[in-house]
Amino acid sequence: QAASDSAILVNTDNFVRAETDLYKAQQVKDGGFSKFNHWRDFANTDKQSVVRSNRDTLYSSAVFDLDAGPVTITLPDAGERFMSLQVISQDHYSPQVIYKSGKYIFDKQSVGTRYVTFAVRTFANPNDKTDLAAANKLQDQITAEQAKTGKFEIPNWDQASQAKTRKALLQLNEGLPDTNKMFGTKEQVDPIRHLIGAASGW
């Protein structure tokens, strides 16, 4: 199927950026632009927003436009509870994963792209409503500050060629025994595995 005149064909050269933009656009649609959107319950495997998600983890995510200025994220003190902040660039690199409470500042230079996704994972016991409520309170204590709100402007990626490329990459993923070197910083990943991971590992 041919792309429309205004759509950009997607192939292995630009798939990582197109696929990452797709997920960021979904996060924006869900209300997570320039502020955190919190999932208060555990991911429904039929309706999860990413390919891989944990059943004992609550997710909070936000997309920011770093052209509008740096962002300060504050993680609360979670005590013994697992809480992490993953930073994801538009090129599906993860320049930082943070496990300690505190204030952290991010800008375009440190992230590497205009748009960034902040993904916070908070552990909760799926069989304990009291524990779930405590985890929800921690989610509410996650804060994000930016002097001004930016805009969300991404290319018009051609969905048909993007889907075709994704399907081919998922076929390549079937023979891989693990996800080693798919995710991490640019220096940590293997370029081919990183490309496959963009299709299989969101």
Regions found by a protein language model. Give the residues of each.
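A compositional/structural signature for long, glycine/proline-rich flexible linkers
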Residues: 2-202
